[in-house]
């Protein structure tokens, strides 16, 4: 049998040049694959296998581009500078023009002004119309993807613009906070109108709780809106000039106890920044304001000027207190800063807690500083701002130490109220660190005040009764309960003549009580 060989196709012989290029491409491919794998591991993973900070930061930035930023962290980003302004009401003279400044305009991110809202509807209509077109499925997917990206880009830039507008500086009109005296029958406040429908029930409830030995009588009722329902803030103070300062969201209101009117308002630049603490200097009209952005501002109420803006904190400043010219401020990161307001380099000392600062109080003689934190630590510090950084005493509590005050007639005695899971009043002797008296209230204690005229103790409570209670000292025998609020009584303040008490509650009400024998 003869075999016939046929040539089916010509054999291709690779030349040296082809082999060289093939080798080069293989080498480059291996190098690129190894390099990308190595770099991704290096960039995205840390030695312990967790995500790196750069990857975490990129994901946060992508979220901010799509959504309004969350206020889930007390740490301040410091991404915008504040320009504050102060305003008087009608009964006051016009503000000083020397301080009035026009804030620099904020540069907005790109905004698609040429794309109306109809553009979004057009994109949706085009997406729906693709279902009826007899085109290949792959082509439909590509077109849908392109139209979806156009719609998403438009919505993202709209969200970014809204975020920037929230931080836009300037004296914008604030509708989220207000303060006015209740006019009883003619009052037009929303909550007051609702209460009129239940008037008979309210009167009966109050009548049943009136006691013959009552020493507190309601004198003025105020409606307030914008008071943060935050247990860890200190938003009320009454000074020696009979002026009450109260923080309502991004505005500090100044209420005159003599005229019984709101005389001044101090605005923070943006609704995103709120007043977190207020404190008057011992003698004078200098007001310290702590903000949620970590700033401590000093204002002179008489001249209507901001004296200075002291930086240093990186989180919410929830507590302030004065000791002559030394201002102490506490933040939610657990730092306590001492500021000497007389000098340019104001920061003269720092103290440290493990958790956030809830309260700061200097003793009446100014020799000791008491600080309470959210983890239940109560520390007593010496009066040496630039020196010793270790506490004299540490007295642990089962809950946060927020309701705290020094006894005005016993300089070494400190009263502390327990939180939700505690409810105990504890009286401490700070000389030896002993708990000398205690009483169970069966309720959260939100505020605590000493009453010098009758040598008694007043506490403001939370759920479920939201009452104010007077206790006899030192026996801590309950004298009477007072019901003037439907929300927890977060703040209490005593007038300079010690005859009136200002109470502010979470339900948007504030009362001025007449106090005496």
UniProtKB/Swiss-Prot annotation:
The GO cellular component terms are: anaphase-promoting complex; cytoplasm; deuterosome
Q: Which Pfam families match?
A: WD40_CDC20-Fz
Question: Which tissues and organs express this gene's product?
Answer: Expressed in multiciliated cells (MCCs).
UniProt xrefs under InterPro entries: Cdc20/Fizzy, WD40/YVTN_repeat-like_dom_sf, WD40_CDC20-Fz, WD40_repeat_dom_sf, WD40_rpt
* UniProt KW keywords: Cell cycle, Cell division, Cytoplasm, Repeat, WD repeat
Q: Does the keyword Lyase apply?
A: no
Write down the Gene3D superfamilies for this protein, in alphabetical order: YVTN repeat-like/Quinoprotein amine dehydrogenase
Q: Where in the cell is it found?
A: Cytoplasm
Specify where it is mainly localized. Answer: cytoplasm
Q: What induces it?
A: Specifically detected during the phase of centriole amplification.
Identify the PROSITE patterns for this entry. WD_REPEATS_1 (PS00678), WD_REPEATS_2 (PS50082), WD_REPEATS_REGION (PS50294)
Q: Which GO terms describe its biological process?
A: anaphase-promoting complex-dependent catabolic process; cell division; de novo centriole assembly; positive regulation of anaphase-promoting complex-dependent catabolic process
Q: Name one GO molecular function term.
A: ubiquitin ligase activator activity
Q: Does the keyword Cell division apply?
A: yes
According to the record, where are the WD repeats? 270-309, 312-349, 352-391, 396-438, 440-481, 484-517
Q: Which family does it belong to?
A: Belongs to the WD repeat CDC20/Fizzy family.
Protein role: Protein regulator of centriole-deuterosome disengagement and subsequently participates in the ciliogenesis in multiciliated cells (MCCs).
The protein in question is named Cell division cycle protein 20 homolog B
